[in-house]
Regions:
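Alpha/beta-hydrolase fold active-site loops
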Residues: 9, 43, 82, 107, ...
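Gly/Ser-rich "nucleophile elbow"/oxyanion-hole loop immediately N-terminal to the catalytic nucleophile
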Residues: 55-89
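Cell-envelope and extracellular/periplasmic
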Residues: 14-21, 72, 88-90, 95, ...
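Short, solvent-exposed loop/turn and secondary-structure capping segments
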Residues: 21-26, 57-58, 97-98, 121-122, ...
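The feature captures the conserved acid-bearing segment of alpha/beta-hydrolase catalytic domains
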Residues: 108-167
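Active-site machinery of serine-nucleophile hydrolases
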Residues: 10, 14-65
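Proline/glycine-enriched tight loop/beta-turn segments at coil->beta junctions
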Residues: 2-10, 130-131
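Primarily recognizes the serine-hydrolase "nucleophile elbow" in alpha/beta-hydrolase
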Residues: 81-129
Length: 167
């Protein structure tokens, strides 16, 4: 949805794995409560749908990079210094990856039930890359799909570095 006004922010909403597909509908329902709130404000909203099978390995990396390419090529006039990214579960994992790969691209990030390190190999990440992006992360302690310990670790590391993180 494009704003009627120029230079408004862009919100990118990323869905969970259950909304993968090619119908361009499932991701709308996955983010419906947030979408309903955002359409009351003057902003631009992008809800890309991940194709089936894009939640692992190279396919996931291709999807993640395609989100940024899509935002870069949007044919609307929006404030490129106010790009906010929000995702749940699989989408939360994508949020962590996007802000890691493109650390100064997003104005702020909200990964919900996501994981930067699903393989728990934290040593391969330089957490200093994430310090400049304000993050509000949330995770349920009884999540059975995405383990909370990755968010626990990431939040602790970022707090040590003085990052702007709420968890």
């Amino acid at each position: 949805r494009a704003s009627k006004n120029k230079n408004e922010p862009l919100f990118i909403l990323l869905h969970g794995a259950g909304a993968m597909g090619s119908d361009n509908l499932k991701q709308l329902f996955d983010n419906l409560p947030l979408y309903k709130q955002l359409i009351k404000t003057d902003c631009n909203i992008l809800l890309p749908q991940a194709p089936f099978g894009s939640n692992r390995g190279e396919a996931m990396q291709n999807y993640i990079k395609s989100i940024k390419r899509l935002a870069d090529k949007l044919p609307i006039d929006f404030d490129r210094k106010r790009i906010y990214i929000i995702g749940t579960s699989f989408g939360g994992c994508c949020v962590w990856q996007l802000i890691y790969l493109f650390p100064e691209y997003f104005a702020a990030a909200v990964p919900v039930m996501g994981s930067l390190c699903p393989d728990h190999r934290y040593e391969k990440y330089d957490f200093r890359r994430l310090v400049k992006t304000p993050i509000w992360a949330a995770h349920s302690s009884d999540d059975t799909n995405v383990r909370i310990d990755s968010d626990d670790y990431c939040a602790a590391e970022l707090e040590k570095l003085g990052a702007d993180i709420k968890y």
